[in-house]
Amino acid sequence: AYPDDFILGEENDLYHDVKEGRVWVLDPIDGTVNFIAQGRDFAVMMAYYEEGIGKFGLIYDVSSDLLFCGGGPFQVTCNGQPLPAYQPRPLNRQLLGANGSMYTNNYRGLANLASHLLGVRVLGSAGISMSRVLKGQLLGYFSSISPWDYAAASIMGEKLGYQLLTMTGEPLDYKSRQAVMFIPQAESDKIQSYLGSRKR
């Protein structure tokens, strides 16, 4: 129906630069191991870009029947209810979402950061983890993931005061697997100072 649109996705090695044309970024099952082993905590994700500009994102938490959507010109909602922008709280009253291996190996100081928080949650799905960031249930999410894992949350998060950066504080390339952090802009300097990634 849209022959001039492109797809970026993990399945079938579908690749197209999000900066070129109209691009749909798709992840039909995020959290595959959770899906197989537990039958829950997996997500369906989609994002849409025009010439590199994110127009909207969608994360569907299947087992909880929660649909997160919006971003760009659209309000971000969960099952139709508007989500508020990030509301600052002391770090020691917040939880962190993370890749288990990166946390246990203190990758780029991640465990150092976690020591200043209430605790760490390893959920096994980027989509589930980042949707909980959007709801204010997690301060941020840290993992090594690909564009189809983070595109939807990036678009929605920008609308709510979050940013997606590499673990060294750089913009993402939207082309490869990278170690990323999805964090509130308001806490960025503080978080990066604990990680040792803040630019001088």
Model segments located where?
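ATP-dependent small-molecule kinase catalytic core of the GHMP/sugar-kinase superfamily
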Residues: 62-92
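Short helix-loop capping/hinge motifs at secondary-structure junctions, enriched
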Residues: 53, 75-78, 82-84, 163, ...
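Short loop/edge segments at beta-strand edges and connector loops
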Residues: 9-11, 80, 124
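An extended, acidic
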Residues: 87-200
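DPxDG-like acidic metal-binding loop motif
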Residues: 18-74
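N-terminal subdomain of lithium-sensitive/metallo-dependent phosphomonoesterases centered on the IMPase/IPPase/PAP
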Residues: 1-29, 193
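Residue-level signal for inorganic ion chemistry
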Residues: 7, 32, 61, 70, ...
